[in-house]
Amino acid sequence: MKIYNTASKNKETFKTINNKKLIKMYVCGPTVYDHAHLGHGRTYVAFDIIRRYLEHKNYIVQLIINFTDIDDKIINRANEQGTTIKELSDKFINSFLEDMEKLNVKPALIYPRVSEHINEIIEFIKVLEKKGYAYATADGVYFDTSKYEKYGELRKINIKEETSEQKNININKKNQRDFALWKFAKPDEPKWDSPWGEGRPAWHIECSAMSLKYLGDNFDIHGGGCDLIFPHHENEKAQSECYTDKKWVNYWIHTGFVMVNNEKMSKSLGNFSTLKDLFEKYSAELIRFFLLERHYSSPLDYTEDAINHSKNNLDKLYNTIQNITVAFRNSEIKYKLNEIDKNTIETIHNCTEKFYTAMDDNFNTAQALKYVFEVSTAINKYINNYANSDELPNYSIILKSYEFFKMVGEIFGIFGSSTINTATNTNIAEENLINILMELRADLKKEKNYNLSDKIRDKLKEMDIILEDSPKGTIWKKA
């Protein structure tokens, strides 16, 4: 399996720490001053699929997603709304978790809050200061980037050129590239005691301290949106490797932007759609499917046409699953395979291998999805081949297709509204009742009691059970 590592700008063969089956993953969480938008959704759906695939390959994934609940934006929004920082943060943390649940994003192991890790942050800064990497000024404590030779490595920037272009000069800094670790308190802001004076943590130090506490001084995967590469992840990397004197993260993974009219979707530009707004127009599963149709690192254009295109694709797959469900009840075990049986089995086998190859190639969901549709086409053709035949489909082939779609659903986190997890939306008692009603309807038709037989058909339709008559008899399926 290969993963594109932002640090090396190359795909690298994935190896866990000490080749163990445990994977430690830290994904930067939201700053909780507003509802999550589609860009957030993309990041956490992408890492959820990465996690699901790793778990499918029998890894144990320890996922940490933090909440930044101390920030200028939160302070300003709380003042605007006349509420406390705690109340505002709690509101939007709960909102975020609700959105993730709807998107079928599996919960993280821990969701640490910055406000609950002040002591760890202070201790982290004290170590940096003791080692000579941090210095106090009139307005806070800063990290000295000149002491870290690898600064700029993640973004691949020329520090001297970038520094010379700096426009906002802070006279308190030794170097304009230096960044804050601790900010001294301003009136009416949250503050904590520290060796340097009352204040609050700066942004970048938060994730370094919390990841150290929960994942240790070296972990497998650190991720987030590509807008975090610089300055956030660059600064995290600098302070963490100076703290630990070793490589901090083995693989850096970043998701691409969601674009609207060729601009990044963001709150600062005001061109964003919250997930809650989108859920009023589309199903959460459709949003998730829309997000996975493109590779996680590619820009994703959000338009209504694109969403509708995704809906058509998802509907096609649901139709296939419905056909498989019906075929389960109308197939038979055969010990000899005919030519179409052999071709269909070969297609399912080959596409399964190609699906895994695509996912092993930097979690390429877009490529993997092509093979899902290839199986969909093949199994529909196979089932339709028997529609007007006296023979029934081979049960083992229907089972193979069912297992394929079940695997895809588990990895992609989709098909939750389908029959794929149980092969039927009905329990055994309901299925038996439907079969009894179908037999009764058949008897009524033989007696030419069409009014009553049609009434049974119509009543079942009201219950979302569709009856389809064919030369081989009547079959039923969910609407």
Swiss-Prot record:
Keyword presence, ATP-binding: yes
Q: How is the cofactor bound?
A: Binds 1 zinc ion per subunit.
- Kindly state the positions of the motif 'KMSKS' region in this protein: 264-268
Supply one GO molecular-function term. Answer: zinc ion binding
Query: Does Metal-binding show up as a keyword for this record?
Result: yes
Chain residues that bind ATP: 267
Q: GO annotations under biological process?
A: cysteinyl-tRNA aminoacylation
Motif 'HIGH' region, residue range(s) on this chain: 30-40
Q: Which UniProt keywords apply?
A: Aminoacyl-tRNA synthetase, ATP-binding, Cytoplasm, Ligase, Metal-binding, Nucleotide-binding, Protein biosynthesis, Zinc
What Pfam families does the record tag this protein with?
Answer: DALR_2, tRNA-synt_1e
Q: What's the family? A: Belongs to the class-I aminoacyl-tRNA synthetase family.
Q: What is this protein called?
A: Cysteine--tRNA ligase
Query: Which species is this UniProt entry from?
Result: Methanococcus aeolicus (strain ATCC BAA-1280 / DSM 17508 / OCM 812 / Nankai-3)
Q: State the taxonomy lineage.
A: Archaea, Methanobacteriati, Methanobacteriota, Methanomada group, Methanococci
Gene that this sequence comes from: cysS
